[in-house]
Amino acid sequence: MTFTIGVDIGGSSATAVAIDETGDVVDRYRVNGRIEGGRQVVASALAAIRSFQLDECVAIGIGVPGLVDSDTGQVTMAVNLGIGPRPFPLAAEIEEALDFPVVIENDVRAAALGAHESLRLIGDMPDSLAMVSIGTGISAGVVLRGELLRGTHGMAGEIGHIVVDESAALCRCGQRGCLEVVASGPAIARAWPQGPEGNAATALFAAAVGGDPAAEKVAGRIAGYLTTALTWLAAAYDTDRIIISGGVSDAGDTFLSAIRARINRQAAVSDLAARRLRPEQVTLALRDDPPGPRGAAVLAARSLPTHSLPTRRVSPARTQATNAK
């Protein structure tokens, strides 16, 4: 049995899965530890990959934040990982250490492909899909007819820097009122400081459902900003499905209900809006099958000359966690 490995690099962990020819996740590992700078990105990825028995591995895929050139294997502007405008040769570093072919992709785009593949393997075949990650930042990945949309400059899906409120604060990108400034995890924490640290979105939307007038106002404003972005995605790409992931999505059904209520409000006054985006098209990412590492593994498989799509799905294997040195 041969398999590919997919790795998802985050600011505090690297999660890896091994996927066989059928699409089954045969094993998975997570390496915990703060990741800061290109050297630590490489070290964390290698630690996760070396957790597997590599005798049957044929290729490796890595999803990483920032601007990714999948042709050269280089990463820039992965700010949360300490990688700036100078290109970092991530793929070459991993290839040199392990002697396997390596492909890299933006983490949210890899997650979009992973989500699309998971649906395909259970017989759900969306023609197009968008994955929207809402956490420290906001970004999207789009899959059209089974293929990732990257864009001319590798910036497709950077919706965090769509201006949605020109009266809001200045963004680090230089614009005022970007979506990321008003609706990301840190933005919600600033708008609702009553919530516990790291869990402001859950506290906010729960308070709004509970009838707190101040929470209702803040939650409504944030849901409005996010619905504007989702509507833009639906209009631009005519997506069958929009899946929300990231830390803010941990707020769960109360958060999703607020988004769907906004979509319903638009549909009530416009037949075009009702056709463009329906509430049931927007869902939250599944927790039991992380799409990021799966998508990276799929990209690794697609890079092989003999690649063919798997036709069945078996339940994921166990999760193991180790601590980074």
Where are these regions (language model features)?
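ATP-dependent carbohydrate kinase catalytic cores
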Residues: P101-A115, A130
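A charged helix-plus-loop insertion that forms the helical arch/lid used to bind
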Residues: Q74-R86
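Glycine-rich phosphate-binding loop of actin/hexokinase-like ATP-binding domains
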Residues: P126-V182
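Conserved A3 ("GATE") glycine/threonine-rich loop of ANL adenylate-forming enzymes
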Residues: S13, V108-A110, G135-S139
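ATP-binding/phosphotransfer module of carbohydrate and carboxylate kinases, centering on a glycine-rich
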Residues: M1-A59, D69-Q74, A92, E96-F100, ...
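Short beta-strand segments
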Residues: D8, G61-P65, E105, A130-G137, ...
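Short hydrophobic alpha-helix segments
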Residues: Y29-V31, V79, T152
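A short acidic/small-residue loop/turn micro-motif
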Residues: G33-R34, I83, A156-E158
